[in-house]
Each structure stands twice: as structure tokens, then as C-alpha cells.
């Protein structure tokens, strides 16, 4: 898709079923390296998923995609597994580095290309490697690859992450899944996607518990076969649609969700004057004319997600008065601001904070997506 042509002033209404979460599906797909046979349902059929499937096929897994059912079937029966993730399959998908943990755990070695750059900021893998070294892996960086080895297997450890990282938490959990002994991970990411990965691993035979920001892992003794797992809904997709509904909706109903996983977003929209009704598995949003100003800061879950920062900023342009949003996760996530200003938004950036003066009447313009 090279361009989208959008004709404005269209009032939206209807029902939307939310897709499965890409950010949950990717680490779970990587986790199937630890399994014998698994079926994953509610899979979103997006580019990163297909890239991860190609990577797993390259490694040696047998995979069948049932597109109409949004289901992927995985068989891990190949004895000649490659413990390599080449650059061509990792450069466009940062989640490729998540095969590092399960390859080390099951096959005691891995050679993984360093991920490519990211437009929204630097996202180093140093915390991934920090955790794996604590578990006993020998790691070196050579010719653009992470070369890791654990000849005698990984051993449980007490790991204190210096900062919260979703990817590093996931890789550490995957690596420690069948490590010898107990592992304690402190200062972990506890996003719903991380919890969904742990739910899959526990179905597989894992013994993993979450207590606050601590994850306790007792090395798995026996893998269960023929497991089925339904991936959770995409809370970022839902949040995006909710904001769109607040902007141009008449009445929109969202299905296939768990409202308690997006309570922060619901609270923010209510504070901004958005009319909505949240139930356990559905949310209704009604036409909202009097949008109120608000000050926000992006934070790790359960705080306001950085992945909805750009979307909520559009809603802020409709608010009466000055709204502010601080980006505390990434250092380069205001690339959408010049494009919104082209459409008529009044936005100023000071350090890590965007100051939005509203209300602004946005008009159609040619803009660039990032």
C-alpha cells in the first residue's frame, strides 16, 4: 500500500470485531520452538506474522496457515533444526530476536542477526543479552550477529532488569522456560501480551507465576503436546478505533475484547468527555462534541501506551484549551507532529512534551505516514 486517499466529514457507525494482537502472537510463535505440536487461533494476518512464519520455517518448523480461520498450526518434528536467524528475515521485523531465547533453551546455541533500525528511536537488545548472560549463556557480537551458546544448558538465576523492557522480559521468560532450577525476574514488563505468552508457556507445561513486576519461573520438566491457544485481542487496534469513534463516530460498538485490559485508555477518554459504555467484552462509543483538555504521559503498562500517543494527540486538537502529552518511552516519537501541523494543528514540542492548543479545525492535506 503506497497511499490512502481519505475523504473527510463522514460520520461512522456500526460494529467492529477487534483483531488478535500482533504483539502477543509474535513471541508466542517464537515460543513454539519449545513445543512439539501447537495450534494458535485469533492470529492477525499481517506482514510481521508472515515474516516470523518464514523465519520459523527456515529454522525447520512445519507450519500451516489457515487464513480463513486466522489459525496457524505448528509441528516441530524436524531433527535437523537450524539455530540461525539470518539478516534477511530479521532486518524488517525486530521480533525476530525473540527466537534467541527458545533456541538457546532447547538447542543450547543460536546465531541471530542484530535487528534493523527503528524509526521511533533506538531499541537496543542489550537487556536481552544481559538476562541471557545471567542464565549462563556465553555471548559475543560478531559480523552483525549475536552468537550465543550454553553448552551445559541454561541455569536459573535472579535477574534484576535496570529498566522495563517488553522484549527483554519475553526473551528471558522464553530462555528460562526449561532452565535448570528457579529463575526470578525483577522489574519486568507486565503487558497483557507478556501475560498471554506466559499463559501459552504454562499450557505447554511451564511453571511460571507473575507477582507484581516480578516473574517466578520453575524450569519445565515435561512438555505437553497438541496444545491450543487463542491469542488475545489487539488493545492498540481497539484504542485506535476508540479514538476514531470519539472523533467522527455516531455510535460504534467494539466486540471480542476484554475491557479490563484497557482501563487506563477508557479512563482517559472519559476524562476528555468522550461518551462511552464499557462492559466486559464490548465497548460502545457515542458521538462526543465537547472534548476536554488533558495532560498525559506515556508509561509502561498499565499506564497510557506509547503506541496510542499519536492517536490521542489528534483528539487533543479538538479539545478546548491546552493539552500536553509527554513521551517517556521513545526519544523520537513525535514524527507525526509536522504532518498534523500541515493539516492545521497548533502543536509545539518542548523537550519530550508536545503542547497542543485547541480546538483546531483540521483540513485535508497531503501527509506522510511514519
For each feature predicted by the language model, list its residue ranges:
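Short, structured segments at the rim of ligand-binding sites
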Residues: 1-370
